[in-house]
UniProtKB/Swiss-Prot annotation:
The protein's name in its UniProt record: Structural protein ORF387
Coiled coil: 315-387
Subcellular location, record wording: Virion
Highest taxon, organism lineage: Viruses
GO cellular component: virion component
Region (Disordered): 365-387
Key words of the record: Coiled coil, Virion
Length: 387
């Protein structure tokens, strides 16, 4: 099972990354709402630990990555609990499998990561997304390129198909670890609604391969993946599932989303607010360095001295952006061929149509609330003067 997931991870397309980040395997029950906690993670790499253990503490850098966690309701209305499993690194499930597995040793518990931005390891809270889902989708397998397999037809699966219709973006008022496996997030009341999500989601089909020969399963997987879908089969059941973007533009939207997320991360780690709280790491003492030189496999506890660390964008995330840029370039090339000499749509206008929750500057939400409070205070003062 682990080997199969590792094989699938190697060939993920940009929209698949985004679906891993934001989309559940099936529509959420009850209220059909999902909360996603977004943060920057800065754990030390094994290469980093080895470097400082040898006493090399000059010009230290650590990659910063965006990560996402599922959340569940807390005791208070404004509280959310983020679970230990990280959707991108697979933290807590398969430590060796995930988008960042080659760069980070993500086997540490959340209790070993903190929210004090001047320390490494640590998390930098970004925002919480509240997404609303609808199931009003009808789809024909032929329209997605799925053909019958040995006389067996693909069937539309309403329970696994949905679209995201709207959502809210919340500031994080406070984030703190409550136990080794979870973290409590207190949300700012100042939320911002956005409605740029219409039509973005997944459509799922299933095919009953009960008692079918192995070749039929192989054909189904090949058929699904050849049209850009994600193939899934539960060995305890007969059906196989094929999940695809809701429409042909979903891959474009996902690529655009990745580029915008990348820009947001670059902006964040280059901001004055981020850099003025310089990240530091506990340096090893002389005895720890001496022990390390005797046996490089020995774990070294940190010493009392703190050394500065510069944040940089992780190389795996950069690779992901390169793939997104390639997808966007292909789309632009096709558009140029179609439009010919016609006037092209301005980039800013076209981006407004794309799935883009981060187009809203969540850091500005507090300012908007302050302006609203100032207006209310001014109205209150005017009322007092009149009386």
């Amino acid at each position: 099972m682990v080997a199969q997931e590792m094989a699938q991870e190697k060939n993920l397309q940009p929209w698949e990354y985004v679906y891993d980040l934001l989309m559940p395997a099936k529509i959420p029950p009850r209220k059909r709402t999902k909360y996603i906690y977004l943060a920057l993670a800065v754990p030390p790499t094994m290469e980093f630990n080895k470097k400082i253990s040898k006493g090399d503490t000059e010009d230290l850098e650590l990659p910063v990555y965006p990560v996402a966690f599922n959340t569940r309701p807390g005791n208070n209305k404004a509280d959310r609990i983020a679970t230990r499993k990280d959707l991108l690194t697979r933290l807590g499930t398969y430590p060796t499998v995930g988008l960042y597995a080659n760069d980070y040793d993500f086997t540490m518990l959340i209790k070993n990561l903190d929210f004090k931005s001047e320390f490494v390891p640590g998390y930098f809270p970004l925002a919480v997304l509240e997404l609303h889902f609808e199931r009003d989708i009808t789809a024909n397998p032929e329209d997605y390129g799925l053909k019958p397999i040995d006389g067996r037809e693909w069937v539309f699966d309403p329970d696994g198909s949905y679209k995201v219709t709207s959502g809210s973006l919340f500031n994080i008022a406070k984030a703190e670890i409550v136990d080794p496996n979870s973290v409590t997030i207190n949300l700012d009341k100042n939320s911002k609604e956005f409605n740029a999500l219409n039509g973005y989601g997944v459509v799922q089909f299933y095919i009953d391969l009960n008692n079918a020969p192995w070749e039929a399963y192989a054909k189904a997987a090949e058929e699904c993946e050849s049209v850009g879908g994600i193939y899934r089969h539960d060995t305890n059941e007969g059906p196989s599932y094929c999940t695809l973007p809701l429409n042909k533009e979903a891959n474009i939207k996902a690529s655009e989303f990745i580029l915008q997320l990348y820009d947001m991360i670059k902006s964040k780690i280059a901001s004055e607010d981020f850099l003025k709280r310089e990240m530091t790491f506990l340096a090893p003492g002389p005895k720890q360095i001496e022990d390390f030189l005797k046996n490089e496999m020995m774990y070294q506890p940190p010493g009392p001295k703190r050394i500065p660390v510069k944040p940089v964008i992780g190389k795996t995330f950069q690779e992901m952006v390169k793939v997104a840029e390639q997808e966007m370039a292909k789309v632009a090339e096709k558009r140029d061929l179609i439009l010919g000499g016609e006037e092209k749509e301005p980039k800013q206008k076209s981006q407004e149509k794309l799935f883009n929750p981060f187009a809203i500057d969540y850091e500005m939400l507090t300012e908007e609330q302050q302006q609203q409070n100032e207006t209310e205070e001014e109205e209150k003062n005017n009322t007092v003067k009149l009386s």
